[in-house]
Amino acid sequence: MLQTRAKLQQALNSLLAAKSQKDRAAAGDRLVTIVRAHVASTVTAVEEPFPVERVLRRTLQELGDIEAPVSRLTDDELETFNRLLPWGAMTLDQAGREVGQVWSADKRGVPSGLIDPRQTQFDKVFPLKGRTVMEIGCFEGIHTLGLLLLGAEVTAVDGRVENVMKTMSRLWAYGRACELLLWNVERPAPETLPKAWDVLHHIGVLYHLSNPVEHLNELLPRTGAGLLLDTHVMSDEAETSESYAVGGQTFRTRRKPEVYADSSPFAGMEDHAKYLVLDDLVRLIASHGFGDLRIVSDRDERNGRRVTIWAFR
């Protein structure tokens, strides 16, 4: 098994390093050969194809028959595109070429699909087509692109100008565009922010904030119909280290250092963040009139407990 993994990793590295269509095809064939040989030698079959192949299949399905502008770039032009900005995540074009770059082997180390499964699941229950969506923390535009492919009208914000530029570039690569605003959400909302929207899309940001309660108090009243929130939380009061009061209510929190705030695109904008207790977070959301609140995912990750919450008025 270890030998097979080593062969797979070597073949994957060759695929990721390939510059021409011919080299990519050859590397892909080697991957398929290794996987087939492993399946033939074991009792339990591999249920899914290798991740890169699976992501490419998803990409083709998500884009449909429309050729993305990035697919018309030559290999040299795409290489230049990928070098111009400090990417931390990548997707694939319709030929299986990388758009962007990976951050590291253990973080965003493989290509992402264009529509996040959390978005797909939410869309099945609450269709996004034709709805206005406020996306908090667009990062490099992958979630933004997913929302647009699902038919939403998106306004996306981020506190780092390089993330706004990367989002703009990735959307161009796939023939999409939306309203993009530079806004550090630790600060008051700018006048240019829309006054209202149908859905608040909030994935992977809240647990990076030093003021999560004030932040949600500003955004939830402007949210007319639905919330998709994905964040780390504290399980109970025993895990908290402090509390703070906002608007006459007390919230239990645990202070977390944001040690890479100045160097990592994945960190928050301040030197610390506050993790909320799940019960307090649910109470806060409900206080803004979201009567139908569902915890659709509750899991343990590297940085602790993480939940996906849907809420509807």
Regions found by a protein language model. Give the residues of each.
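Conserved SAM-binding loop
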Residues: 167-168
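Conserved SAM-binding strand-loop segment of SAM-dependent methyltransferases
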Residues: 175-187
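S-adenosyl-L-methionine-dependent methyltransferase catalytic module, highlighting the catalytic core
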Residues: 197, 202, 210-312
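Conserved SAM-binding motif I beta-strand of class I
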Residues: 153-159
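Conserved class I S-adenosyl-L-methionine
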Residues: 131-139
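Conserved SAM-binding loop of SAM-dependent methyltransferases across substrates and taxa
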Residues: 140-150
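Conserved alpha-helix/loop element of class I SAM-dependent methyltransferases that forms part
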Residues: 109-129
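Non-catalytic N-terminal targeting/anchoring module and adjacent flexible stem/linker
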Residues: 1-101, 120, 172, 290-292, ...
